[in-house]
Amino acid sequence: MGYSSSTLVARTLRGGLGALQTVDDNTPLALSTSSPDDPEVVVLSPTLDGGWALLGEPNKWVSVSPQRFTAVQSSAASASASFRGADGEVVTVVFRDPHGHVSSTQCKIGTSGNASVKVTAGASTGVCA
C-alpha cells in the first residue's frame, strides 16, 4: 500500500476516533455500507516506531500532510510531531499510543509559524511547544 509499516490504523470520518481498526496482512479493513450521497471516508495511518500512530487532525479529510507536519518521532514511551501553520491558528493533533489509548492536544501556532507536541504513553493530552 506504499507504507513502510505493515500495520496501519484505520478510522472513518463518520465513526470518529472511537472506531479505530488495526489493519495488517492478517486483518483486512472492515467497511460498512455507504452510498454516493453518504460515502464512507477511511483514513489510514502507518504504525510508527514503538507502536504509535499519528492520526493527525481529526476533522480533516487529509489528516496528515507534508504541508502541515514537518517531522514525527516516536519510541515506546512517547511520540512527538512538529507542524506549521498561520500565526495564532489552533491545531488539534491526535496520536494513538502503543496500548490503544488516544490522545488529543490543541496547540496554538506562534509567530514563527511553527509548533510541536509531545505525548507520553497513556496520557490523554500532550504538551505543546
Residue ranges and their predicted role:
Residues 2-6:
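Short coil-to-beta strand junction motifs in C2/discoidin
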Residues 11-129:
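Non-catalytic C-terminal accessory domains or segments of carbohydrate-active enzymes
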